[in-house]
Amino acid sequence: MTQNPGKFIVIEGLEGAGKSSAITLVHDFIEKHTGMAPVCTREPGGTPLAEKIRDLVKNAEPGDPLCDEAECLLFYAARAQLVANVIKPSLASGRWVLGDRHNLSSIAYQGGGRGLMSLVKTISDATLGGFKPDLTLYLDIDPLLGLERAARRGALDRIEQQEIDFFHRARATFLAQARDDSSIVVIDASKPLNEVHKDILACLSTAL
């Protein structure tokens, strides 16, 4: 008997949008829906190599700032490893995969935020070849509100410390991508948490 492939669901959003609580909610929904907990991934990260890259991009060496192009390439190196060694094998075995960020983050942050859209498209095509999530939930929030929330969690990492205009550009790119791709659903993350979660569950029930 041929194994039915699993589905790949991704949670996206700016810093402070509430991804962590959304991931817990979606995890429980998938487990109830399928009878099995999903394979959970994060980007960058999710494999031994990708976790080392995560540390590099989040905590650059003092005196050796990470240039935008190197940052972009590192994200895609981590993603390629994760897709090849974890995501695709899990889906092929029938497991569902729940991702904390995926390619849309690079499109928004490196493409929109850094102005490297041409490079992002080239590397994305080369490393992913059209592979994409079945459903992406983008938690939309004003960058100022999101960063205020993130700051309350503790010290901000290198990317969270970017100038505010960077996040405005990233947000605009997230929203533009959602307008052009029906598999990306925008969730208003500025609402009270219980309302955000109701919207997420309604979306999952409709889409899946």
From Swiss-Prot:
Enzymatic reactions: dTMP + ATP = dTDP + ADP
E.C. numbers: 2.7.4.9
InterPro entries: P-loop_NTPase, Thymidylate_kin-like_dom, Thymidylate_kin_CS, Thymidylate_kinase
A GO cellular component annotation in the UniProt record: cytosol
Binding site for ATP: 13-20
UniProt keyword annotations, A-Z: ATP-binding, Kinase, Nucleotide biosynthesis, Nucleotide-binding, Transferase
CDD domains per UniProt: TMPK (cd01672)
Class of this enzyme: transferase
A Pfam cross-reference name: Thymidylate_kin
SUPFAM superfamilies registered for this protein in UniProt: P-loop containing nucleoside triphosphate hydrolases
GO BP annotations, alphabetical order: dTDP biosynthetic process; dTTP biosynthetic process; dUDP biosynthetic process
A GO term, aspect molecular function: ATP binding
Family according to the record: Belongs to the thymidylate kinase family.
Function: Phosphorylation of dTMP to form dTDP in both de novo and salvage pathways of dTTP synthesis.
NCBIfam families: DTMP_kinase
The protein, known as: Thymidylate kinase
Natural source organism: Shewanella amazonensis (strain ATCC BAA-1098 / SB2B)
Gene that this polypeptide is encoded by: tmk
